[in-house]
Amino acid sequence: MVQCTVTSDGPIRDCLEWIANNYACANPVTAMAERSALTSRTFARRFLAATSHRPIDYVQALRVERARALIESSGGRVDDVGFSVGYEDPTFFRRLFKRTTGLTPAAYRRKFAPIAGAHPPSVAVDGPQRVGLQ
């Protein structure tokens, strides 16, 4: 899971805030490096120092985290979920998702998506309670 990283490195902090909302863009690492006004190499070194992750690993973890949430909460096609988080190649998305979570996207949905018609544990399914009526 991607942790919210706090850093005093201004350009990296700005990039982390930007990528949180723009993770699906094409070439996000290049976009962050350009945004930071640092060379690609300097950006990568400073990003690693600030987050303990390589930029591409951070972006992929963020994308998979968002994909997990979408798979759990929507009935949309897995390929569409992959596209929505920034992957143009469905095969690559499925492989990366499985490598990250240990499950294929379809298996993840079967395991973690709520069952249709199920009630949350806090909802009474026996009908309304008659409190105070005699």
Q: Locations of the language-model features?
A:
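Basic, amphipathic alpha-helical hairpins
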Residues: 4-28, 47-51, 68-77, 97, ...
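Donor-nucleotide binding loops and adjacent catalytic segments primarily
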Residues: 14, 38, 42
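Short hydrophobic/aromatic patches on the structural cores and recognition surfaces of FHA
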Residues: 43, 67, 93
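Key DNA-contact positions within bacterial/archaeal DNA-binding proteins
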Residues: 41, 90-91, 106
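Terminal helix-turn-helix DNA-binding modules in bacterial transcription factors
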Residues: 26-30, 38, 48-89, 110-134
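Generic C-terminus detector
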Residues: 94-95, 107-112
